[in-house]
Amino acid sequence: LKPFPVPITVLLGVATSSILLSNTKEVLTGYSNTALWLIFAAFALSVAFGKTGLGHRIAYHLVRLFGSTTLRLGYVTAFLDLILSPATPSNTARAAGIVYPINLSIAEAVGSYPGETAKKAGAYLLQNGYFATKVTSFLFATAMAPNYLALDFITKLTGVSLNWAQWAAAMFVPGFIMLMLIPLIGYMYERPSVKDIDNKKIAADGLAELGPMKASEKGLIVIALLAITGWILPTFDIKIDATAVAIVAMIATFVCGIISWDDLLK
């Protein structure tokens, strides 16, 4: 019997050994450094958020609750990026695959298209999304692929090692201040002509298109929360390797049928 492709079976063995024997470096010694593996493994969560539609569902609920004006929508999309960023190390997948389509659909709903009508809302929303992603990408170590590589270089050069929670604590104040200012400054600069948004209708249409929440979305919520918890635990002197946590999370998305190996390769 071969219930899963060979690469997934191999990774399952790697994950089991890493967790049970705490020998992540030894297990991955032939596969470059652990930082690269963490990035690759956590990328599966980025793919899962896009494939399941969970990212879009979260977005439409935020739009329904808070997006009654263009300025509020700026904050909604910024904080959507913030919510997704701890579990999506690909800021391209996060911004272009989840946040951008939401901004685009809202802009089109108010008749804002590239060209003469861009100033209605589209120019502001898309610019705001771009700059918000730049901030969320450094707020968490797992929010952008190069972050853990940078940590690896810092550790090798200085001997200073930061875990996931320490990185987040160091970046929180400057990051949060910037995230609060970006939508407002962008709004003052772009001055969108459309001020009020029919957010209830936009959200209702979007959620209707997505349909009821699927089992894969519920499973992804559990996996993402457990992964983030695993990355935080070393702060409390609980020895668990961040790379091992990421690999287990990736394996869980495969085993639960949330994504396939081909989805990850794409």
Residue ranges: model-predicted function:
Residues L1-F4, L80-S90, Y130-A141, G230-F236:
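Transmembrane alpha-helix interface/packing and boundary motifs in multi-pass membrane proteins
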Residues L1-L38, K156-T158, Q166-K266:
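Hydrophobic transmembrane alpha-helices of multi-pass small-molecule transporters
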Residues F4-P114, D262-K266:
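Membrane-embedded alpha-helical segments and adjacent helix-loop junctions characteristic
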Residues A42-F49, I83, A87-S90, V135-F138, ...:
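Hydrophobic alpha-helical transmembrane segments of multi-pass membrane proteins
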Residues K51-L54, N91-A95, V110-P212:
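Juxtamembrane and boundary regions of transmembrane helices in multi-pass small-molecule transporters
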Residues L71-A78, G122, L126, S216-L225:
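Short hydrophobic alpha-helical membrane-embedded segments
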Residues V76-T77, N128, A170, V248:
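Hydrophobic core positions of alpha-helical segments in small-molecule transporters
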